[in-house]
A protein has these predicted regions:
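ATP-dependent adenylation/nucleotidyltransferase module used to activate substrates
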Residues: 1-143
Length: 143
């Protein structure tokens, strides 16, 4: 029986580290990034670069390429949400606050229900994989 996982990959440190762990623990890895109109595009670019590098070399800790699965990677566009979400982090929102992350500054950077939206989508993908394969499919979020 193969072990499957669907991971939400933002391109930040937490989800990138989680991806490496999933490569060690699972037979199939599906990584999904979300383009929701975020101003900080660098994380999406880093996620795509990381997947390309890992799929090219498929080497982690000096082991052979056969030791780790190829990453199935998708970017899901949620740009229809951009106009509906009130946050400094999305295109069209207020400026991202500078300086210390005081409580008032933090409020401006919250994207309402973002992680729940991501979790719902990766859960749906995992359920589809489980239905197709007849095997369990886990979800992983490095948030």
């Amino acid at each position: 029986m193969e072990r499957h996982v669907v991971i939400s990959l933002s391109g930040g440190m937490d989800s990138s580290t989680l991806l490496l762990r999933c490569l060690k623990e699972y037979d199939t890895v599906t990584a999904i990034s979300f383009d929701y109109g975020q101003k900080h595009r660098v994380e999406l670019e880093r996620a795509q670069s990381l997947v390309k590098i890992l799929n090219f070399f498929r080497l982690v800790e000096g082991k052979t390429k056969d030791a780790y699965p190829k990453i199935n990677y998708r970017v899901i566009k949620l740009d229809g949400l951009t106009d509906l979400l009130n946050s400094a982090l999305v295109t069209g929102g207020d400026d991202v606050p500078e300086g210390h992350y005081a409580e008032e500054n933090m409020k401006a950077t919250v994207v309402p229900n973002r992680n729940k939206i991501f979790a719902s989508i990766i859960q749906a993908v995992a359920l589809s994989i489980a239905d197709k394969t007849g095997e369990q499919c886990d979800i992983a979020m490095g948030i």
